């Protein structure tokens, strides 16, 4: 379950550029719910989703995932509770790393990472099977750099 209560965010408070982006937003999604966030430009859609992900601290309110209050958790710790698919396929992957390295790094979300992105042979085989299901031939290109993929291919790797 995702629950946001009274989430507020003001950018540049007290300045001539002050922008009240979120004004007490409430949202409750139960497990299995599907939601679409719709609004005009500047309505606060991305700001709200970024607040949930922890891109910046909220001014007030609470955000819970599965009953765990993540309101004050840094973004990297929230990664164990939240997955994101970015609009821009260039985000969410590291273009200068191979497909296999991106998948290995993603599989360790929420864990401390060392200096190596390598994966174990059984993990590589699991990645190959997952990619084969996409029917894009990416399972044969595990050593290709993600930056060389099309936008759609890159989006699929990110997901």
Region spans (language model):
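ABC ATPase NBD coupling module
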Residues: 15, 19, 57, 69-83, ...
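The feature captures the beta-strand-to-loop junction immediately N-terminal to the Walker
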Residues: 38-40
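Conserved ABC transporter NBD signature motif
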Residues: 61-69
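Helix-to-loop junction immediately C-terminal to a conserved catalytic motif
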Residues: 53
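Conserved ABC nucleotide-binding domain
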Residues: 130-148
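Q-loop/switch helix immediately C-terminal to the Walker
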Residues: 88, 96-112
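Hydrophobic anchor residue at the start of the ABC signature
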Residues: 159
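A short, flexible loop at the N-terminus of ABC-type nucleotide-binding domains that lies
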Residues: 1-4, 10-24, 36, 74
């Amino acid at each position: 379950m995702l629950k946001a209560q009274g989430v507020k965010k003001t950018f540049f408070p007290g300045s001539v550029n002050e922008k009240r982006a979120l004004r007490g937003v409430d949202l409750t999604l139960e497990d299995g719910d599907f939601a679409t966030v719709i609004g005009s430009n500047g309505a606060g859609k991305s700001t709200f989703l970024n607040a949930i992900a922890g891109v910046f601290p909220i001014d007030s309110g609470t955000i819970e995932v599965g009953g765990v209050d993540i309101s004050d958790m840094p973004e990297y710790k929230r990664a164990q509770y939240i997955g994101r698919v970015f609009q821009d396929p260039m985000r969410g992957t590291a273009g200068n790393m191979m497909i296999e390295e991106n998948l290995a790094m993603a599989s360790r979300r929420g864990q401390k990472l060392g200096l190596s992105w390598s994966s174990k042979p059984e993990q590589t085989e699991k990645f190959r099977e997952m990619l084969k299901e996409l029917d894009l031939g990416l399972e044969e290109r595990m050593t290709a750099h993600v930056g060389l993929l099309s936008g759609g291919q890159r989006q699929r790797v990110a997901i």
